[in-house]
């Protein structure tokens, strides 16, 4: 049976000092030790909550959330993570702010950050915009701190941008690590990141990009599968190739869903929009070309409709490793006969993995909390020990 000291010992064996007072943009910005520290600390925080030990490292402070796209799981995961550490969450509704009246990013970032310790941002809809916006926010609060406007520089956590979805993908990895009995057991395991049909269009590229950008770090055999014309960002493909070479894993692209599923230990069938089309959409929005946007939407819907056979079926699942591959999804999935007529996954497959999917999602609040804590505590291992010795109950019995 594990004790808190087991997690503390693991943390003490890792080098993650550069995460202190730093931000989290992309998983491939971080070292292997830094990624492992997040998983270890996430497990430690979960252990403490399950044992009714308060993990509040803040007596006051704000966690600011900015969501430029719809969210349920990530929104509540960020709020849960902040609450777990003692921060109060304040969501910035840009429609109700002065941004519509010409307030600059620098001004907004500083005005919301006087007592903020963390800012979580989701900005995933437009290629070339989300990651850039997050960087601009960080540059703004960094300068505000240097100029003495802010008492502290809030840490940024990327809650999804146009390039990566790190909190989601780190939660996937945490789930896989637990299911496979340890990080070292992921080496050589096959994961299929495959496109799947959806009756909608424009789903973000950051999920498949985040998966191939992270899982190739872990020595896994990563297969990216999609119909021709559904390519992801070339820069992220290059990252995946380099990661695989360094980790001893592998990375390849196929246009055959069955090839990807064959003998896979983990499958992740999900729809996404073609990179080239999303670049075009960004340019059309920038030009205010509504007719062009409408035409592109119809073009993409017609393109999707040609690939309705790209679906996670019982037949395909039988071809995976022992017919029992792990099935991942960020949710909500497009389920045949439930949320749509034709979609990403057959209802019987989804129903069989429902509990596993919910369990997978439960790792995200702890992953986000770990990211925040590593950025705000100079010695997280010592902080864990102090929290244990303090002995404050999370909930009175």
What are these regions (language model features)?
Residues 242-346:
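Rossmann-like adenosine-cofactor binding region
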Residues 320-397:
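Adenosine-phosphate binding glycine-rich loop
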Residues 56-177, 335:
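Phosphate/diphosphate ligand-binding glycine-rich loop within oxidoreductases
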Residues 185-187, 216, 315-324, 352:
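Short, conserved loop/helix-junction motifs that constitute active-site signature segments
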Residues 68-80, 177-291:
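Glycine-rich phosphate/diphosphate-binding loop of Rossmann-like nucleotide-binding domains
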Residues 1-76, 80:
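Positively charged, low-complexity intrinsically disordered leader regions
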């Amino acid at each position: 049976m594990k004790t808190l000291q087991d997690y503390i010992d693991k943390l003490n064996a890792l080098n993650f000092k550069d995460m202190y007072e730093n931000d989290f943009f992309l998983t491939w910005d971080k070292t292997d030790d830094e990624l492992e520290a997040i998983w270890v600390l996430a497990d430690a925080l979960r252990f403490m909550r399950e044992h009714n030990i308060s993990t509040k490292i803040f007596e006051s402070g704000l966690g600011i959330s900015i969501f430029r796209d719809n969210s349920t799981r990530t929104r509540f995961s960020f709020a849960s993570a902040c609450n777990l550490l003692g921060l109060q969450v304040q969501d910035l509704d840009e429609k109700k702010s002065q941004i519509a009246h010409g307030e600059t990013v620098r001004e907004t970032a500083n005005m919301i950050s006087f007592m903020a310790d963390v800012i979580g941002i989701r900005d995933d809809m437009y290629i070339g915009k989300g990651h850039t916006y997050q960087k601009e926010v960080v540059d703004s609060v960094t300068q505000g701190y240097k100029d003495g406007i802010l008492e502290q520089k809030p840490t940024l956590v990327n809650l999804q941008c146009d390039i990566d979805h790190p909190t989601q993908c780190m939660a996937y990895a945490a789930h896989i690590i637990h299911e496979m009995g340890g990080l070292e057991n992921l080496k050589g395991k096959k994961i299929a990141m495959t496109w799947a049909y959806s009756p909608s269009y424009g789903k973000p590229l950051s999920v498949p990009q985040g998966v191939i950008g992270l899982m190739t770090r872990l020595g896994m055999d990563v297969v990216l599968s999609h119909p021709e014309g559904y390519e992801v960002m070339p820069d992220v493909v290059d990252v995946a190739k380099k990661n695989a070479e360094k980790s001893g894993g592998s990375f390849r692209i196929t246009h055959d869903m069955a090839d990807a599923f064959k003998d896979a230990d983990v499958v992740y069938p999900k729809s996404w929009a073609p990179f080239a089309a999303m670049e075009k959409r960004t340019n059309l929005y920038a030009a205010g070309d509504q007719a062009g946007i409408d035409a592109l939407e119809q073009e993409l819907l017609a393109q999707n409709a040609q690939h309705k056979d790209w679906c996670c079926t019982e037949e395909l699942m039988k071809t995976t490793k022992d017919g029992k591959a792990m099935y991942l999804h960020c949710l909500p999935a497009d389920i045949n006969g439930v949320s749509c007529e034709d979609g990403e996954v057959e209802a019987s497959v989804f129903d069989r993995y429902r509990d596993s999917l919910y369990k997978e999602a439960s790792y995200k609040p702890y992953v986000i909390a770990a990211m925040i804590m590593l950025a705000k505590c100079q010695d997280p291992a010592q902080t864990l020990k102090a929290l244990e010795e303090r002995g404050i109950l999370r909930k009175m019995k």
